[in-house]
Amino acid sequence: MEILAMRKVACSIIFLIGSALPLALHAQFTHSSPLPERIDINTASREEVRELPISTALADALYAHRIAKGYYRSVYEILEVPGMDKRTFEEIKGLIAISHPEERREVSKYILLLQERLAAEESPREGAIDEWEDLLLSPLNINRAGVDDILLLEGVTAVDAVSAVKHRRFLGSIRYTSALRDAKYLTPYGFRNMRNYIVTTDDETDERSLSMHYRMRYDHEDLWLGDEGSYSYRVDALNAELEELESDTVDNLYTSLTNAGWTPEQIYGLKQKLINEREALKVARTPGAVSNRLRFRYKNHVKLGARIVSQPGDDDELIKQYAMFTGGPFLDKLVIGNYRVTIGQGLLFDNTDEERARLTQRIEGLFGDLTDTDEFKLSGIAAEGRLAILHPLVFYSRDRKDGILNRDGTVNSYILTQPRAAFGDVFSQEDYGGELRIDLSDMLIIPLGTYVSLNAYETQMSKPLRPDTAEVDIPFDKDRLDDLNYLMMPSGDKRTYLGTSFRTVYRNVSLEGEYVSQQEHGYGYVLKALVQFNTFYVIYMKRHYGLDFFNPYSRAFSEQSKFDDTVVEKDYRLLDPLYADLQDLPIPKAEDGHYFETRYQIAQNLTITKAYVDVWRNLAYDLDNVRIQGELEYRPVFPLRFRLKQKWQVKQLPKAILATTSRTQETTLRVFALVAGDYLSLEVRYGRVRLTPNELYNGNLLMEGNYLDAAWEHNFSDFLSVVGGAAVWDAGSMSQWIFEDVGIDFLYGEGKKYYVTVKDRLSENISLRFKVRRKSTSYPHTGIYGSSNEYHYGDDVPVLVRDFTDVRDQLSYNLQIDVRW
């Protein structure tokens, strides 16, 4: 009933404001006199576009559409502009001219826009952003592209790609990209996503003998006094553990380890390891991460790339480089150095350090790698070819990996942590395998875009993997690391995986899937179905990952990572507090689930932008979980949009005797407005989590949190813009998350922050982004020993305990410079 009441109130507010604001904004709709000459809509400034005999709001929409989507290739494309009707179009059609300036002039702008895609709930991964940037520099010739080539493009489905190829076959060739509008089953959304990355002739691609792209990024962020998980917090946790390892006290960690069979030498080794980690964190206190990246391209045949990243606290820099050769008669790509491989649904192989929950789409194939991925990077040689209907991909890599070492020198687990300290490069690993894809397109009655593949890879470690709770968990304490996701990890120095994947497309329906079996262990599979129309789509995904299936390179669709909701989240239950970083391993948890997703444009001004239901089971404990989320957008007039999002989640958490249940609700209202060329947004969220009654919670069964966020962007010109944002929050006992600029920020306690970002395209080939942010967080500590102002007796000494508030202030700034020539 509470949820229903909240939804009714929110809907009432939306429609009340939506009814009043059209009148308030009516002043923008002014009319100008007819023009004696035509305006080139592709080169005109905002002020020149406003001289058209249309409303100011519609003129701004015409201009904004060009900035966001690229140059108009036909006068009829202005019909796509929100608010443009056929009558207005006929009135201004004769007043508009369409020129065809070089697309490369807009590359710097689109690269900046791509960076902002990272600030989204289901954002693309860094590797995908890199590939799309490369396609902006070297567009895809749609007249020579195959289905798999088109699927590299952002937001393009298998149905879209097949429809584009079929339409090209029907026409013989595509003269203008706008001709793809008429492709059957290609949605307007799919076409818009393609448009900035494709051309129709080789003459339109950048065929200069040599082109280069250099990027420098500097991140100055104080990780010492940050939020939970800050370096100062970690140092305190390490100091507390070191105190417990002193041998002159009773009933401490030293005693427990001795009773568990640890020798004094082994305990001393653990102590020295913790000291080394603490000192590395202190060194990393000085902020300042620097990244330098350089990419060369000789026509479309040779690509070279190199990147050096220096992180505070790490003695060794992350160095990546590759050389890629393309365009051979039977060899599509040959890569030497660092590279990425993605096969099928990512169940067998997708080497990235990034985790993305509910990822329904990924780009497949072989790519050079200059991303931040370190632990799961590949270093060696790989090739992708084409021989008739056979499309082979093979790879070999030898690289050093980070991990937790047992006392006997074996590897307990992979780990991602920063700084790497004692975990860095402790063993080496060889990975080799590949995919043999068989293209069945147009064979007999088999539809275009159909393939089946045989996939395999093998891992050889220099030190065997041997998971052992006695090497990670504090012995004899209350909480035990007894989760089967950990206990059923395989042992040994060699692992072999065999699998198959497939895809087929029929009209507006696509089916995809992948199955992988780990030799002498478990298996996993993913199935995906898509049905799409112009205003509506439905995705269904089924996944199953067995308890005894462990694949460190698996990044298939999942809701939780492997060690999420386990004891490793509690650093005080571990022999080394930094072992808590195990929860960041991006490997899917053993789960079985069903996922449904849809988008539906109900009317021109009313759209369900995205809604999904995920029902999954934690196979380690047979616990069922549900997550439901939906977002509704209402646009009463073009410059104004409201978005109301609601999330419900019921999650069961394993406990020693009986599982507990948390029930989460989040309501978010966002308002967007485009006023006189400025972009304004306002967001408010309220969240609450209801817990299962437990004496440990002292009656605190309800956690609540909220925040208010506002952002504004002003375009001073086509090249210079400034973005400003501010937020205040009271997260209570829960955590909140918020998107800003090009990333995500987690909110704890109470606080406020503001940021300013300057984006400037200094020339057609030089762009700059500078951001400064100030964040202040307060952590109230109340009722530590019951009511305030009570005496606590430690060592028979009375100490008055008072409530207090911990305040942390952070100042960070980031600079990114892109230069192309």
Describe each region flagged by the PLM.
Residues 3-13:
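Bacterial N-terminal signal peptides that target proteins for export
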Residues 27-314, 318-322, 329, 338-342:
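Compositionally biased linear targeting/interaction segments
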Residues 235-267, 345, 349-372, 396-428, ...:
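A subset of solvent-exposed loop/turn segments in beta-rich extracellular surface proteins, enriched
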Residues 280-287, 376-378, 427-460, 464-469, ...:
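Exposed, low-structure sequence patches enriched in small/polar residues
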Residues 296, 302, 312-399, 531-554:
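Outer membrane beta-barrel
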Residues 307-319, 369-372, 422-427, 516-522:
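Outer-membrane beta-barrel proteins
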